[in-house]
Swiss-Prot record:
The gene is hppA1. It is found in: Cell membrane. Mg(2+) 1 binds at residues 191, 195. This is Putative K(+)-stimulated pyrophosphate-energized sodium pump. GO terms for biological process: sodium ion transport.
Length: 676
């Protein structure tokens, strides 16, 4: 173990170096003409101002919670240090992704003047910075924390050391929740405000420079889908590895007799390290010069499949070497997670792509008005829970039968092992979306806009797939953390006949609904302020509609920023306070019930909201292609309404529930000593 464990931070550093190379490649691309540079600078400036203000606000929470951890927990000072370290690295990953995306958008537009190949290369290189930064910083921080604690504090046993390292995961979760909620509120407030007044009331196209909220809308794409998604999956990535290490330290003696505990702890770290290398190799398979969206999809799938195959092959040798006779069982549990993640992505694509039946049915319903569109879309969202639940259930069953609770955790590690490339694919989308907006605002030729539209259309699908993947990985990670909590407090089962446990179960099932309500209302409040401001500018700025005067873009950015930072606090506090209160007042069994209830209901709500929102979005896009009357028709107006309702579903509430269930689970794990 002494030498092999260093493979984790070494591979993590290789991932970070690759991210740095990708950043330089993006930076070396031409930035375009003066107008492209001006628009890019506005988006970049707005995004970085928001991110800096958000991180300053979160820093207050991090410092406060770190002090509490240091004062009340055993080994509190060390746990608090890991907590702060995890938070800082999560913020760093978000900063790197945002910085790159907001310089890559204009460069992608400029590259599109040379063809789809150069534009695709720039946008994907930007996504690679986010993907490799997340896995590199996550694995580096987690493995380094473990190595330092094991080397310096030799009097501590392995279980105690891993429990201290759990603070790192709590830090990641804390940043993730605020980044996801705050980013989701910002992006959808700007998006809804821009669409309602611009498209519906003023009748101007999307990304029209006359719209005062258009820059805020483009800033929001980066805030929500780069920093927010990155923090979400960083949390899942770190949480799955940490949960597996915890279960290894606590159950290895019974699950894997005669195998050194150190070997069992090493497995998730080494599989994740190999996944980074496989993801880097996979990026070299993502190449295309064809203009069809199907060719771009194929390029992405080639990269993902290559990374998965390499990870599967390497995982076989790792598990066989470290776990001996038990290696094959753990290997198949890992594969179960990998396959489940891939299949959930395919199911998500089926329900949200406009060339598949569910979304086509939603688009068709727009012909009879907004109400039937909302009804059909919501029904399809609920229907879409079936197969993800079946897939996750089968993966859990297989993993548990093969390797017990450790198998479930290693399945989550397997699902996230190739996160480096899957997040790179996901983070490409907002860059392509921004590039299309910049092409529109800078009055590029029609063929340039066609290229950016093609890239954007693929980006919409990859974003939907990414959300499905994030939900599935969140469910497995939360379950693994829940198992770790159960072992820590001595829960062998959740006894629903116990009144306290049943109370905890019902509270847990309710929390995702309350949380969703808070975040959706926050979007509504913030969007209302943006709508009022956009209407004011159209009314008061002479010559704005005629294109003779410029709008005040900064005002809408300022409103969205202020609203997001103000509204993200109550949901964030709920996720931390609820498990602590239930655990302290009703006991560890009730808290176990709360975690079980929140995972079960949260998984369903997140899938429903994400897929319903994705279907409404792409149903509108299908109509905009000229179907059912095209743009400006009654069907299109109904489609815009559905898309507007779906925006906070798929980009705010749904994704944030992932973090809610994971954060409550890691809070329970870290503060478990208080409940015993």
């Amino acid at each position: 173990m002494d030498m092999l464990i260093y493979l984790a931070p070494i591979c993590a550093l290789i991932g970070l170096i690759f991210a740095g190379i990708s950043y330089k490649n993006v930076q070396n691309e031409g930035a375009g003409n003066d107008l492209i540079k001006k628009i890019t600078a506005s988006i970049h400036g707005g995004a970085m101002v928001y991110l800096n203000r958000q991180y300053r606000a979160i820093a207050v929470f991090v410092v406060f919670l770190a002090i509490i951890i240091a004062l009340i927990l055993p080994n509190g000072a060390l746990t608090a240090a890991c907590f702060v370290f995890g938070a800082v690295l999560s913020a760093t990953a978000g900063y790197a992704g945002m910085l790159t995306a907001t310089i890559a958008n204009g460069r992608t537009t400029n590259a599109a003047t040379r063809g789809i190949g150069p534009a695709f290369r720039v946008s994907f290189a930007s996504g690679t910075v986010m993907g490799m930064s997340v896995v590199g910083l996550g694995l580096f921080g987690l493995s380094l924390s473990f190595i330092i604690l094991e080397s310096v504090y030799t009097d501590l046993d392995l279980l105690t050391i891993v429990n201290i390292v759990a603070g790192f995961s709590l830090g990641a979760s804390s940043i993730a929740l605020f980044a996801r909620v705050g980013g989701g509120i910002f992006t959808k407030a700007a998006d809804v405000g821009a669409d309602l007044v611009g498209k519906v009331e003023a009748g101007i196209p999307e990304d029209d420079p006359r719209n005062p909220a258009v820059i805020a809308d483009n800033v929001g794409d980066n805030v929500g889908d780069i920093a927010g998604m990155g923090a979400d999956l960083y949390e899942s990535y770190v949480g799955s590895i940490l949960a597996t290490m915890l279960l290894a330290a606590s159950t290895a003696a019974t699950t894997f007799p005669n195998i050194p505990v150190e070997n069992v702890i090493l497995v998730p770290l080494i599989i994740s390290a190999i996944g980074i290398l496989a993801s880097i190799v996979g990026t070299f398979f993502v190449r295309t010069n064809k203009t069809e969206s199907s060719a771009i999809h194929m390029a992405f799938n080639m990269g993902l499949i290559a990374a998965i195959i390499l990870t599967v092959i390497a995982s076989y040798f790792v598990t066989s070497m470290l776990l001996g006779e038990y290696g094959l069982n753990v290997f198949f549990a890992t594969v179960a997670g990998l396959v489940a993640g891939f299949l959930i992505g395919q199911i998500t694509e089926h329900y949200t792509s406009y060339d598949r039946k569910p979304t086509l049915r939603v688009a068709n319903s727009c012909q009879t008005g907004s109400a039937t569109n909302i009804i059909t879309g919501f029904a399809k969202g609920m229907e879409s829970t079936l197969w993800p639940v079946v897939i996750i259930s089968i993966a859990i069953y297989i993993a548990f039968q093969l390797s017990g609770l450790y198998g479930i955790a290693i399945a989550a590690v397997g699902m996230l092992a190739t996160l480096g490339i899957s997040l790179s694919v996901d983070a490409y989308g907002p860059v392509a979306d921004n590039a299309g907006g910049i092409a529109e605002m800078s009055h590029q030729k029609e063929e340039v806009r066609q290229i950016t539209d093609t890239l954007d259309a693929v980006g919409n699908t990859t974003a939907a797939i990414g959300k499905g993947f994030a939900i599935g990985s969140a469910a497995l990670t939360a379950l693994a953390l829940f198992a770790s909590y159960g072992i820590a407090v001595g829960l062998s089962a959740i006894d629903v006949m116990n009144p306290n446990v049943f109370i905890g179960l019902t509270i847990g099932a309710m929390l995702p609904y309350l949380f969703s309500s808070m975040t959706i209302l926050a979007v509504g409040n913030a969007a209302g302020e943006v709508v009022v401001e956009v209407r004011r500018q159209f009314r008061e700025i002479a010559g704005l509609m005629e294109g003779k005067a410029d709008p005040d873009y900064g005002k809408c950015i300022a409103i969205s920023t202020h609203s997001a930072l103000k509204e993200m606090i109550p949901p964030g506090l709920l996720a931390v306070i609820a498990p602590l209160l239930v655990g302290l007042v009703l006991g560890p069994g009730a808290l176990g019930g709360l975690l079980a209830g929140s995972v079960a209901s949260g998984f369903m709500i997140a899938i429903t909201m994400s897929n319903a929102g994705g279907a409404w979005d792409n149903a509108k896009k299908y109509i905009e292609l000229g179907n059912f009357g095209g743009k400006g028709s009654d069907a299109h107006k109904a489609g815009v309404t559905g898309d507007t309702v779906g925006d906070p579903f798929k980009d705010t509430a749904g994704p944030a529930i992932n973090i809610l269930i994971k954060l409550m689970s890691i809070v329970a794990v870290v503060f478990a000593p208080l409940f015993m």
